[in-house]
Structure formats: C-alpha cells, structure tokens
Design a protein with these regions (language model features):
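Internal alpha-helical scaffold of NAD(P)-dependent oxidoreductase catalytic cores
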Residues: 69-87, 129, 133-136, 147-151, ...
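Glycine-rich adenosine-cofactor-binding loop
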Residues: 148, 164-206, 213
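Adenosine-nucleotide cofactor-binding segment
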Residues: 191, 206-230, 241-244
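Rossmann-like NAD(P)-binding element
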Residues: 225-249, 259-261, 265-266
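Short, well-ordered alpha-helix to beta-strand connector turns
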Residues: 183, 206, 234, 257, ...
Length: 380
C-alpha cells in the first residue's frame, strides 16, 4: 500500500537537539503560509505535530517523494535562518504506508523516550483537529486521524498503553530525586498542560509543591515575583512554561539557587542563569537508555501492526466503494431502461415474462460482481 498519497518528515529527540526542534515551531499563520506554498506542489493537506520529543510534518500528496524533499529542505532552511553553528540534523522521511506505520508507532508511544507514553496520543489528535479547524486537512488525513485514534483506544482497552504519568513529567521527577532526594521541595513554574501534569505527579509521589504562573490564582498559583521569596524553601524548580524565547533570569530568583529542571521547548532558562545554577534541560533528560519491558514493547508493536492491517483493509474497501456504486447504477439502467426498450416489438413472446427473467439474470450478475469485490477486499 505504498501508493498511499502520504509523506511524513520530522526530527525527534534522537535526531535533533531541543533548539533545533524549537526552531521548527510554527503558529497558525506560519502553517497557512507553508500550506499555501505546498498547494502549488500538489499537496492537499498538512498536519503539524509539535511535542517536547518531536516535530513532524505530515502531508497528503500524490507526489510524495518530491514533497518530502521540499519539507526536508524547508527544515534545513529554518535552521539556517536561526543561525545555528555546526552541521544540521538529518530529518527522517516516510512515504505511503510507512508514514502510517510511523504515525501509529508515535501514537502508541513506541517512538517516545518513555515507552508507552500516553500524552503524545492526545497531542497527535489535537494536531489533526487543528488541521481540520484551519481548513488545511483533506479526506485522506481525516480518515488517518480517525484511525490513529482507534489504535490508541484499542491499546487502552487492552491495557497495553503506558500509565498516564509516563511522559516528560516523569523524567523531571526522576531528575529531581536523583539530585535532591525523595523528599525534595519542588516549585513548578507554568500551569499549562505539562505543568499541571507535573504538579499532579509530584504531589501524588508525596512532594511538597509550590505553583507559580504568569496569571496568579490559576490552580492556586502564586505570581512569578514570589519565586525569589521562596527560593530558600525550594530544593528544585521545574520550569514548564511555553514562551518562544528564554525568559527566566537570575533576577527572578533569590540568593540561594535551587536545582532547575527546564522542560520547555525552546529552553526557558537564559544562558546566564544556566551558568549560575545547576540546570537540567530537555536534552539532558532525553539521553541514555531507559529499562525497556520487552514483552510490553512487543505487545505495542503487535497492536500497531494489527491497526495498520485494519487501516489497509479499510482503504481497499474505501477505494472499491465507487465500483460497488457504479455496479448498482449499471444494473438499474440495464434492468429498468435499456431492457424494456430492447423487448419492445416482440411478437408472440410475453414481454413481461422475458423482462422478469432478464432482470433475474442481471440481479444474479450484480450480486456475483459484488461478492467478487468483497472477496477481493478481504483478500487484500
């Protein structure tokens, strides 16, 4: 099924540092500008997935190889515009059915640093929803988005997916405990989705938590100005804000600096503060090898392949639907228009009797064709 009109280009934590992934981030205006350019090259839809682990661009186009090359070149251009030193990362590229397999693996958490991470499935669904809302989706991408959701729901029903707290918040907690112990007092800056997950997990594991946010009062949050007052009472500060540029400076903190865990993308901590305090960023969190439950990995991979097989079958059926519809239209035309015309003027033969028999033959023919189509669909 590699003739599927799909291509996917991206980089993850294994291919590119946080700064390179962050340089690819696009607001909706940038997505629309890219989509306008791509339409000129035969692209009918664009889905943009951006997480702390990866940035991926999925497109629908009959010219998969050419469009994938364009997307890869655009990524390199973004890095050149950012003025990064050193060689640029090498994006990965998938076409046709390989794009679907990779996407299902991402949704299942097989491509995440933490095996079975669940949050990425929700992020992927929101990426498809954003594409539909912004009118840069198409029927092929809509169907694929629905199928990725089905794969995830099946994983959850069968218990193969990871626990909810198996994302970057778990990595942050592990880093804090390695540096500050099991009873570390933790401040969390930023109460977006990731910040709230951090608060929930840290509190669940028995840590004393203080919350800080640009908008104080949200979820019991204190204003950012309060961080400096509390620094002496904090062992670690987890920064989970989503600013486009680094903003947390030395002046925001008190005399005694806690360990800082920066899980923002791009980095939220300025270089001067990172030099002054012990700072752990996403790149430092996403290194090394985590213990892998091989049985669980195999279970996830098996479910992904089953989902891919189901998707393949659905595409075959969807492609044959027009054959079935055309067959029905042909039968109706022959049986109720052309056959009566052909039987006009017959002498001694009873036209009604002949017409009934001919309709019966045509009905049998139609059913035989339909069965053949269904058998072909099942065999594929």
């Amino acid at each position: 099924m590699n003739h599927l009109p799909l291509a996917l280009v991206g980089v993850d934590f294994r291919r590119a540092a946080t700064r390179h992934r962050a340089a690819l981030a696009m607001d909706e205006a940038a997505c629309q500008a890219l989509m306008t350019t791509l339409r000129g090259h035969g692209v009918s839809g664009l889905v943009v997935l951006e997480t702390c682990n990866r940035t991926e661009w999925l497109v629908a186009s009959e010219r998969t190889t050419w469009v994938a090359q364009l997307l890869e070149a655009h990524m390199v251009h973004c890095w050149q515009q950012a003025g990064f030193d050193g060689p640029a990362p090498k994006p990965y590229r998938f076409e046709g059915e390989d794009s679907v397999r990779h996407l299902f693996r991402v949704a299942a958490g097989l491509e995440s640093f933490v095996l079975g991470e669940r949050q990425v499935a929700g992020q992927l669904q929101r990426a498809f929803e954003s594409a539909r809302a912004a009118q840069r989706s198409c029927s092929t991408l809509n169907v694929l988005g629905s199928w990725s959701g089905r794969v995830v729901r099946k994983l959850q029903r069968r218990g193969a997916h990871g626990v909810e707290s198996a994302g970057v918040e778990l990595l942050a907690l592990e880093a804090v405990r390695r540096r500050c112990g099991q009873h570390a007092r933790i401040g969390v800056v930023g109460l977006g989705e990731i910040g709230q997950r951090c608060v929930h997990l840290f509190a669940q594991r028995g840590h004393s938590i203080r919350r800080y946010n640009r908008s104080p009062g949200v979820g019991g949050a204190l204003p950012l100005e309060a961080i400096a007052e509390h620094c002496e009472q904090l062992d670690a500060l987890v920064v989970a804000t989503g600013a486009r540029t680094a903003w947390l400076e030395r002046a925001h903190l008190g005399a005694q600096l806690p360990v800082i865990v920066d899980i923002g993308s791009p980095q939220q901590v300025t270089a001067s503060l990172a030099d002054a305090a012990e700072t752990i960023d996403l790149d430092a969190l996403l290194v090394g090898q985590r213990p892998v439950d091989q049985h669980r990995r195999e279970a996830l991979e098996g479910e992904v392949e089953l989902g891919l097989a189901d998707f393949r079958l659905s595409e075959v059926r969807r492609g044959l639907r027009h054959v079935v519809e055309q067959n029905q239209r042909t039968y109706e035309e022959l049986a109720y228009a052309r056959l009566p015309e052909a039987l006009e003027g017959l002498g001694e033969v009873d036209p009604k009797e002949v017409e009934a028999k001919m309709r019966s033959l045509l009905r049998d023919y139609s059913r035989a064709v339909l069965r053949a189509v269904e058998d072909s669909s099942e065999a594929s």
